[in-house]
Amino acid sequence: MKNIRNFSIIAHIDHGKSTLSDRIIQICGGLSDREMEAQVLDSMDLERERGITIKAQSVTLDFKASDGETYQLNFIDTPGHVDFSYEVSRSLAACEGALLVVDAGQGVEAQTLANCYTAMEMDLEVVPVLNKIDLPAADPERVAEEIEDIVGIDATDAVRCSAKTGVGVTDVLERLVRDIPPPQGDPDGPLQALIIDSWFDNYLGVVSLVRIKNGTMRKGDKIKVMSTGQTYNADRLGIFTPKQVDRTELKCGEVGWLVCAIKDILGAPVGDTLTSARNPAEKALPGFKKVKPQVYAGLFPVSSDDYESFRDALGKLSLNDASLFYEPESSSALGFGFRCGFLGLLHMEIIQERLEREYDLDLITTAPTVVYEVETTAKETIYVDSPSKLPPLNNIYELREPIAECHMLLPQAYLGNVITLCIEKRGVQTNMVYHGNQVALTYEIPMAEVVLDFFDRLKSTSRGYASLDYNFKRFQASDMVRVDVLINNERVDALALITHRDNSQSRGRELVEKMKDLIPRQQFDIAIQAAIGTHIIARSTVKQLRKNVLAKCYGGDISRKKKLLQKQKEGKKRMKRIGNVELPQEAFLAILHVGKDNR
């Protein structure tokens, strides 16, 4: 056990985590040069296309150190985006140490801090690594000072490497072996294994990634899931060297995969403890704290026949992504679907793409909303995650919106622009600290504004230099209203949005104008209105298509023309009474862009 090292690689987006993992795999001979490819651990097509890591991946390698000993390295490559920070904290729970990778050109950014603090809270040994020293813009001395100044860990002798060229990566491994402690645990005690991650394989059923904390797990053992009390047979187990390799046992301190022929998706939840059925452990390991979704949206299959397969797909996906929340929902405009909760807009986009790709579904998404806390006049507190569930205005005593605490790190030059943006987003400044050339800003901004497009606009006002990390702080009373959209005097529930009263006029007008461009013209006028309660705040009309009924009157009497026009008018009236309007998918997506164009 003393030769096992478990560690994660954490860093801000694009600081070179996945490339560093590639080099480590190559040096330790996990894959031959022929099988090697860039970002070998990003196995999902979506990850490769976007060049980001979405799922944490684990690998077991052997490394012969300079002291002549051979060490077993179990390491986990983690995502860098704020939306996937839950993946990071789960990966860290399986480790004793973390490599904090910092780009020697960019320096410390917001996620660097957030991930590093997560690791420190779990009492992990953090080893700083300066990456990308082959870049002409690299300034390792300045960045080492920044790490000490902002993060507060000693970085004077931080290892310098370039994951792309492979310079200094061996030094990183030597430092790892020296600084990260071996796993603790009792190899002879009763088995306790923590499920870090699971996914669904069509042939094997549920595959789980486990970290053995105490005891040993052997092939063929009877294994008990502690939360459900169900027992299974350990059919196959092994490690990833990125490839799946079968083993006969997993020893104390190791990380590996396990197949127990569990067909039920809820059979082995992430964060659960496995123990042996013969000699069970007394208590379960502390799991992970459940994360609360920040953004909710309705997902509906385009054709209602897909509802069943959509439900199965969500089940399989939620096994792989424990932060996804869903419950059935029906809408008069869109039929049956699910209300899903996500950690952020990127997460929502990724889930939608994965459902469409991996499970071949066509989906319509409604506008994302955050959760509001509503106190009714009957003094009940309810949580509303969809505008259609908001009680009528006269039943609401107080409506509170979620406030996010946003930590931003940016160069001084962009401070003015960023502050202007935060004020526009109804933000309140709570802290500002200068670190050399960098400024650390803390603002409290309503979550609804953050999830809309705050991140994109922060990046564009600061030319990509600012970085953001946010978390939910509290609920705060505020003057929010629901803007309904009426089409031919009928409310369309899927188009409603909740917004601040100050913005409601402009948002309503903008939404109505957008809808006017998107709804195809019909044989009769379509009135599109935005309303708060019964008060109409904006209207526009999609003009009817009409035939020129006077074309056949050559010259002719005015009363003849009037008669023909009158007859056409009557016909249109009748049509309008029975006609219904089909809304295209783009119309539902229009809400996503409300408030984005008026920059």
From Swiss-Prot:
It catalyses: GTP + H2O = GDP + phosphate + H(+). Keywords: Cell inner membrane, Cell membrane, GTP-binding, Hydrolase, Membrane, Nucleotide-binding, Protein biosynthesis. GO terms for biological process: positive regulation of translation. One of its GO terms (molecular function) is guanosine tetraphosphate binding. Gene3D superfamilies: 3.30.70.240, Elongation factor 4, C-terminal domain, Elongation Factor G (Translational Gtpase), domain 3, P-loop containing nucleotide triphosphate hydrolases, Translation factors. Its main location: membrane. It comes from the Bacteria. It is a peripheral membrane protein. It is found in: Cell inner membrane. GTP binds at D14, H15, G16, K17, S18, T19, N131, K132, I133, D134. HAMAP family: LepA (MF_00071). Belongs to the TRAFAC class translation factor GTPase superfamily. Classic translation factor GTPase family. LepA subfamily. NCBIfam families: lepA (TIGR01393), small_GTP (TIGR00231). This is Elongation factor 4. It comes from Salmonella gallinarum (strain 287/91 / NCTC 13346).
